[in-house]
Regions:
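Conserved functional micro-motifs across diverse proteins
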Residues: 25-189
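Bacterial N-terminal signal peptides that target proteins for export
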Residues: 2-11
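C-terminal motif of bacterial Sec signal peptides marking the signal peptidase cleavage site
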Residues: 20-23
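Sec-dependent N-terminal signal peptides
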Residues: 11-18
Length: 189
């Protein structure tokens, strides 16, 4: 009797397996991991114009800074990605691209994300900040930012475009003048 129940269980299991696998198909190939970006070039261009630095005192982390220089090359790739992400019409995309290029002519902009372990140290946008930001060119000429703005409310949206932005980092837009103050020559290139 026990042997009969075992055969019956095997038969029921096989019948159920055949019944439920009738609509299944074999996977012929896997698709590569889904890239979160809509355009082919954005990630490589973003990586080319972005850097990260860390400051440690012994084993203690004092600062993480991630920044992207918003060059003309970056702005074109960003505008393409933005247009795809937000499904802009061709006219809207052209306007966004024009706005990006115009902003690039106002000065050298960087998007900067920072992490500091003490919230009181997160004062990059204050005039009396403990931090001093300077843009230094190949000739050693230095300029201070003409604008530094904390972008508090835009973090969730911006993390798609700047993957180093996390909930633990503060995000700033930093604009430097395009020309040196002493020689009035272009600061970069």
């Amino acid at each position: 009797m026990n042997r009969f129940l075992t055969r019956r269980k095997v038969f029921v299991f096989c019948a159920a397996l055949l019944l439920f696998s009738g609509n299944c198909t074999r996977v012929s190939r896997f698709v590569e991991s889904a890239d979160p970006y809509y355009t082919q070039t954005y990630k490589s261009v973003c990586d080319r114009w972005s850097q990260e630095a860390r400051i440690h005192h012994g084993f203690e982390l004092s600062l993480i800074v991630s920044a992207t220089f918003e060059s003309a090359d970056f702005r074109r790739a960003y505008a393409d990605e933005y247009a795809q992400a937000y499904q802009l019409t061709p006219a809207e995309k052209d306007q966004f691209m024009e706005d990006q290029m115009k902003a690039g002519r106002l000065g050298h902009e960087f998007l900067m994300a920072t992490f500091v372990p003490e919230t009181k140290w997160d004062d990059f946008d204050r005039a009396d900040s403990m931090w001093k930001l300077l843009l230094v060119n190949d000739e050693g000429e230095r300029v201070a930012p003409v604008e530094m703005r904390n972008l508090r409310r835009q973090k969730a949206v911006m993390s798609h475009f700047f993957p180093y932005i996390t909930p633990w980092k503060s995000v700033y837009l930093v604009r430097f003048p395009s020309k040196t103050t002493e020689s009035n020559r272009p600061m970069i290139g």
